[in-house]
């Protein structure tokens, strides 16, 4: 292994620079303009985005970010930086940088830092365990666009997914077990993944299959009845059908059916963010309690836990040692 020539670019979705409407508007404009995310004709979509969605949605989303913002910034950025720092300490001669698909630090910034250190073999590691065209696919597009401006490009190893990597499953199982020990075993364990339009699956996206792989591996390794494990999908946007069952509707239903205790984990989120800390830990808690439930716990993302860093290190070393 020639350590000096390798470099790692960790990539996550991104975050606004500040929990203020203007910053949120800039971030959402970039995010929702990506055809991988919203694949509607720009002639139709741009007037709706800039004339309706951004003016009305940005102030509302900014208020939500204000509720979860940390002293050092957005939770997603804080935890992603911590992952980068911890991972860099595992390698003596392999630089590790961070880039966001949308917002800052940008993909360009992360790649530029690596190339300035003489990297010739680039490992791009999107922090999305399950592949989707709207996440990992968007990262690939972003890297490809940057390569178009370069006379000499580095060799590329792109990590498409790690939905059933043994260390990933182990880390999730241990997080769930820790929650069980602290709060007791729930009546239901809900595995909530980010949703995507059903249309994406029908046209070839493997995301649903990869979510199922993760769920089946967890069922096999958890000391918990498989029939009490539920897979749901959150964060739907727009009017077309998305992957179901929907997390929010499931919470309402469970509460109304007499289920008293649920615990929720979001296996597809490598870092806690707005969708986990506010949508799952706050909104869906209310749905469950108001529906009649009594006890609700959110199990945090893997964030910068040692077991998560062990996983990322193993993925990288496996590539470098081939």
From Swiss-Prot:
* Assigned keywords, A-Z: Cytoplasm, Heme biosynthesis, Iron, Lyase, Metal-binding, Porphyrin biosynthesis
Query: Looking at the keywords, is Membrane present?
Result: no
Where on the tree of life does the source sit, at the highest rank? Bacteria
One of the protein's GO biological processes = heme biosynthetic process
Q: Tell me a Gene Ontology molecular-function term this record carries.
A: metal ion binding
The subcellular location is: Cytoplasm
| Residues annotated for Fe cation binding in this entry | 194, 275
> What SUPFAM superfamilies does the database record attribute to this sequence?
Chelatase
Per the UniProt entry, the Enzyme Commission number(s) are 4.98.1.1
Checking PROSITE patterns in the record gives: FERROCHELATASE (PS00534)
User: What is the uppermost EC class here?
Assistant: lyase
Q: Name one GO cellular component term.
A: cytoplasm
Assigned protein family: Belongs to the ferrochelatase family.
NCBIfam families the record matches: hemH (TIGR00109)
Q: What does this protein do?
A: Catalyzes the ferrous insertion into protoporphyrin IX.
| Name of the protein this chain belongs to | Ferrochelatase
UniProt organism field: Proteus mirabilis (strain HI4320)
